[in-house]
Amino acid sequence: MEGARLIIEEINKEAEQKIKYILEEAEQKAEKIKQEAEKKARIKADWIIRKAQTQAELEKQRIIANAKLEVRRKKLVLQEELINEVIGAIKDRLLSIPEAEYMEILKDLIVTGIRELGEEKVVLSSNGETLSLLKAHLKEMEESVNEKLGKDITISLGEPIETIGGVIVQNLEKTIRIDNTFEARMERLQADLRTKIAKILFG
């Protein structure tokens, strides 16, 4: 009986050791699985955070880019509004200038045109009213132009053209022309205005 009891105790002892070993091994495996799971979770969490940060940065850059485009668009609209406002004011002023002042402006435009043309015999074209005004003061205009340029300039009047004012100065053959109509002058002014306003708005 004593021998049987000892054998049973030995069996129980071995069983307990095996159970202990199995439990320890199970705990180790469980800890390893837990650590790997935590590691994977951290990696995934880091990836999610990085992805979110990247997406947030991209969204921020997109918003900034769109805002810059919108600001530029508004500046361009403002630029055109300012140019149109200035040109409109000039047009209104030109359409209401007194005759004496208009004659002085015409003289300056004619002198400038003749200088650029480099001819002593020229033909002037403008609207009907301006041509009638020049016709009535042609001798006086020639004398003023000659005095200004120090040359003997001969001025002829051409056919009426569509313009709000100013003149086109041409050679006799009408192969070379200097467009000093108000529209042409304003077009040149418009380009200059656009440059100046753009410099103010866009730096």
Swiss-Prot record:
Gene3D superfamilies, per database record: ATP synthase, E subunit, C-terminal (3.30.2320.30), F1F0 ATP synthase subunit B, membrane domain (1.20.5.620)
Compartment annotation: Cell membrane
UniProt GO cellular component terms: plasma membrane; proton-transporting two-sector ATPase complex, catalytic domain
Keywords of the record: ATP synthesis, Cell membrane, Hydrogen ion transport, Ion transport, Membrane, Transport
GO MF annotation list: ATP binding; proton-transporting ATP synthase activity, rotational mechanism; proton-transporting ATPase activity, rotational mechanism
InterPro entries: ATP_synth_B-like_membr_sf (IPR028987), ATPase_E_C (IPR038495), ATPase_V1_Esu (IPR002842)
Domain of life assignment: Archaea
UniProt record, GO biological process: proton motive force-driven plasma membrane ATP synthesis
Record Pfam families: vATP-synt_E
Major localization class: membrane
Keyword flag Manganese: no
Membrane topology value: Peripheral membrane protein
Keyword Cell membrane: yes
Role played: Component of the A-type ATP synthase that produces ATP from ADP in the presence of a proton gradient across the membrane.
Oligomeric and partner information: Has multiple subunits with at least A(3), B(3), C, D, E, F, H, I and proteolipid K(x).
Family, per entry: Belongs to the V-ATPase E subunit family.
HAMAP family given in the database record: ATP_synth_E_arch
Protein name listed in UniProt: A-type ATP synthase subunit E
Recorded name of the encoding gene: atpE
